[in-house]
Amino acid sequence: MLSGSIVALLTPFKADGEVDFDGLQKLVEYHIAAGTNGIVAVGTTGESSTLTVEEHVKVVNKTVEFVNGRIPVIAGTGANATHESVTFSRLLNDSGIDACLSVTPYYNKPTQEGLFQHYKAIAEVSNVPQILYNVPGRTAVDLLPETVARLAELENIVALKDATGDLNRVAIHRELCGEDFILLSGDDATGLDFVKLGGQGVISVTNNIAAKDMADMFRLALEGRFEEAEVINQRLMPLHKNLFIESSPIPVKWAATQLGLIECGHLRLPLTELSEKCHPIVAQAMTDAGIY
């Protein structure tokens, strides 16, 4: 279920800052037509930190409604207060989602034991599979492989999204967590190499604007056709890099607007629109990738 090219989906807003649910439906249809293997709703790329609880739950529910069982829907439920993640998990238990993705608590820098207890508390109240999410570049805390292994022993913790970019961890996690534990890359630039080393796929930002290419690349990779996959990867590499020229999702939201995938590139403060000096850089990356 959790493999291939999974999109960390944008949350489209209208010019007045309200969520654009018609735009959300359009994005869902774009991804299904392109062969995307799954959707993460309201993760980091979906601007989870600036949505209200009510908006968060509604975006997830609407995504489930629009997808209508055609591909898996994963709900972002991360927070830096355990009770908040627990609340999201309870609210979404009957939503029809296929899994939850929960980022490590950010800013307050818990210990490894704190991280273990945080995820254990979430797992105990959720009735869907849980995906751990480690992105120390954003959270200032690193979920160490030994802690991942402890968590993998819990019944409904089934996967890890690893956005460290450290490819050595693929083999370490596989050895510690076993063959059945799902390993997903959270780093587009190293995602293909991650799968070459034994991962099952990627949760991707690039997928937002190059969905078919990403789906094709990871289909080829999972079939063991790495040379063909690498041709696509090299063409997309300018996107993998330049979609992070400013904090994500700023560049990818601008790019999606240029491609007509969303009508408005509005972001909620403290995120602001892509700096004008970066426009030609991202535009050139899209041109080099063959999507613009």
Curated annotation (Swiss-Prot):
The record marks 44, 107 as: Part of a proton relay during catalysis. It is found in: Cytoplasm. GO terms for molecular function: 4-hydroxy-tetrahydrodipicolinate synthase activity. InterPro entries: Aldolase_TIM, DapA, DapA-like, Schiff_base-form_aldolases_AS, Schiff_base-form_aldolases_CS. It is an enzyme of class 4 (lyase). GO terms for biological process: diaminopimelate biosynthetic process; lysine biosynthetic process via diaminopimelate. Gene3D superfamilies: Aldolase class I. GO terms for cellular component: cytosol. The keyword Amino-acid biosynthesis applies. Pathway: Amino-acid biosynthesis; L-lysine biosynthesis via DAP pathway; (S)-tetrahydrodipicolinate from L-aspartate: step 3/4. The active site is at residues 133, 161. Pyruvate binds at residues 45, 203. HAMAP family: DapA (MF_00418). Homotetramer; dimer of dimers. Belongs to the DapA family. PANTHER family: 4-HYDROXY-2-OXOGLUTARATE ALDOLASE, MITOCHONDRIAL, DIHYDRODIPICOLINATE SYNTHASE. This is 4-hydroxy-tetrahydrodipicolinate synthase.
